[in-house]
A protein has these predicted regions:
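Integrase module of LTR retroelements
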Residues: 1-164
């Protein structure tokens, strides 16, 4: 979870979850960092949408360290590993993802009006369609086994789009 310097429509936090291998990332803007939010997010965006993970690694923030999360992880038999407090390098994947997302959001917020919360879906889409150096593939292509079709390609059809 990452605090954002300037509030946007009352949102001050971004809850970020990343799948370790594919680098697929889901986010949700938060007004408050509460326990119930983390449990709902894990269930709705990871368990129900993809599958029950064998384990999750989280920081020690309120959205992940609470009874609601503990109960849902116990119910689905998911092991919960926590990164070392005050040692961000202990969860390098999360730190790298957060850094990249904040960079994308900051750039979009400078170029467009409406605050970062309205740009979060666009930033997430940009992150998902970009190849990662570790895998040489985009998270989108690893999850869906196809390349992203951008809105520009739909408006100006390319040979690739015409053959789909």
């Amino acid at each position: 979870m990452e605090p954002v310097n300037s509030p946007s429509h009352g949102y001050i936090w971004i809850l970020v979850v990343t799948k370790y291998f594919t680098k697929w990332t889901d986010t949700v803007p938060l007004r408050k960092a509460t326990g119930g939010v983390g449990a709902n997010f894990i269930k709705e965006n990871k368990i129900v949408r993809f599958r029950v993970p064998h384990r999750i690694i989280s920081d020690n923030g309120t959205p992940f360290i609470n009874n609601d999360v503990r109960k849902i992880l116990e119910f689905y038999q998911v092991k919960h590993h926590r990164s070392s407090p005050y040692y961000p390098q202990g969860n390098g994947q999360a730190e790298a993802t957060n850094k990249t997302l904040i960079k994308i959001i900051s750039k979009m917020s400078q170029e467009y009006t409406g605050g970062w919360a309205t740009r979060l879906p666009d930033a997430l889409w940009a992150y998902r369609k970009s190849p990662k150096s570790v895998t040489s593939f985009s998270p989108f292509s690893l999850v869906y086994e196809t390349e992203v079709v951008s809105p520009v390609e739909i408006m100006t059809p390319s040979l690739r789009i015409m053959q789909m």
